[in-house]
Amino acid sequence: MRNEQRRGGQRRGKPNLLQRAGVVQVDWKDTDLLRRFISDRGKIRSRRVTGLTMQEQREVATAIKNAREMALLPYPAAAKR
């Protein structure tokens, strides 16, 4: 019964953070926005978690990498062994 209800319905994903914030262009200098898309360890969160489209995820990832190069955001922490 549960599967029958899901078939015709739309996929419910996470709300898109960029659209909710009204962001049109992702900027590498906007660290407050970019920090929403990295974990506490500094890793870039996946599309499944953030709810972004493929193009938006690419833009966010590129902006995060540029901000890391400029020392505005941290690189991922190395795992302790």
From Swiss-Prot:
InterPro entries: Ribosomal_bS18, Ribosomal_bS18_sf. Binds as a heterodimer with protein bS6 to the central domain of the 16S rRNA, where it helps stabilize the platform of the 30S subunit. GO terms for biological process: translation. One of its GO terms (cellular component) is cytosolic small ribosomal subunit. The gene is rpsR1. It comes from Saccharopolyspora erythraea (strain ATCC 11635 / DSM 40517 / JCM 4748 / NBRC 13426 / NCIMB 8594 / NRRL 2338). Part of the 30S ribosomal subunit. Forms a tight heterodimer with protein bS6. This is Small ribosomal subunit protein bS18A. HAMAP family: Ribosomal_bS18. It comes from the Bacteria. Belongs to the bacterial ribosomal protein bS18 family. Transmembrane segments: none annotated. GO terms for molecular function: small ribosomal subunit rRNA binding; structural constituent of ribosome. Keywords: Ribonucleoprotein, Ribosomal protein, RNA-binding, rRNA-binding. PANTHER family: 30S RIBOSOMAL PROTEIN S18 (PTHR13479), SMALL RIBOSOMAL SUBUNIT PROTEIN BS18M (PTHR13479:SF40). It holds the Pfam family Ribosomal_S18.
